[in-house]
Amino acid sequence: LYVDTIDGYEFLRPSAWVEVKGSGNDIFYRNPGNVEENCFVAISSPSSNVYTSVRDVGTPEETARKILKQTLIELTSTRLGIVRESEVLDAKEDVDKDGNVFYDITLRIKSYAAKNQYGLTPEDRPQTLEWDRTFYSRLGTENGRLYELRMQSPSEEFEESKEQYLVGMGKSFRPFEVDAPPPSVGKQLGLNFI
């Protein structure tokens, strides 16, 4: 069980997974047996929107499209000849036993690369599959912030990974209330909560 008492969330993670430092996320874990399998938690800034419910982001479908767009931006490549295909596989609302509302979103992104980026004609630049990944996100709110646990796995292994790790980790993800001044008070005091 990973518990962050400062930011206010917890989730179960496989004990063999290792923490990756310096990833830019609140926390990042990777499966050492398959480095393409990983998870991280991202939290909205307290100085941005105040979220009272995950529904503040939109419907599950609208939220899935926003996450897909953001994920594609994060995966932007500066290499020539890169093409990405993406789709929303699933977007649904889930209410836990305590009445907390979550969104469960599953995306699939394929990346194609040209082996000869400088070819003169399209025939000289054939696209080959570089990678194919499935992304699962569980979003919830607490403390006026939006929390996202995002996990990824190679698509061909997703169903196996989903049963072994992703569902258990996702369903265990829970933001909780922390004892911290609201963002408006923190700003008045000159504090920066990130």
Go through each PLM region and give its residues.
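Short aromatic-glycine motifs in intrinsically disordered, low-complexity regions
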Residues: L1-E10, I73-T76, S161-Q164
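Generic low-polarity alpha-helical segments
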Residues: Y2, Y147, S172-F176
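Conserved polar/disulfide-associated segments of primarily extracytoplasmic proteins
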Residues: D7, E19-E148, S153-E157, D179-I194
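Short conserved aromatic/hydrophobic patches within beta-strands of well-structured domains
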Residues: G8-G22, M169-E177
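Stable alpha-helical elements in mature extracytoplasmic
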Residues: R13, T63-A64, L68, K162-M169
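A short, hydrophobic/aromatic-rich structural module that often spans a beta strand
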Residues: P154-P175
